[in-house]
Amino acid sequence: MTTAINLSEKLAKFTEQWSPKIVAQMNDYHFKLVKFQGEFVWHAHKDTDEVFIVLDGEMTIHFRDHDVPVKKGEMFVIPKGAEHKTSAKAECCAMLVEIAGTINTGDAGGDKTAPGDAWI
């Protein structure tokens, strides 16, 4: 790569929600952009941590025993194996950092499972 990645331009290239798009790879990790609103499904990633960096809006990461609000400019690391779901009252844009091949719905599957290899 010989140029910087403009995240605003990348976010403008898609409108679908709950469908992360890969923008870069570092070693075995993907950097993904995602847009979402509403509630996601309860799930876990048994073999990897998951990082959310909020670029615009606000989100909540729900665990069975507590919630973590995450605002624009903040990040949160979800420990591997922790059952969680995300939600946003209004559209939220975030960057995910996770091991390449990580499925967005983890062990839950279902109709919100996105292709894991979509680059923009």
Placement of each model-derived feature along the sequence:
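A cytosolic small-molecule/anion-sensing beta-strand core signal
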Residues: 27, 55-56, 71-72, 90
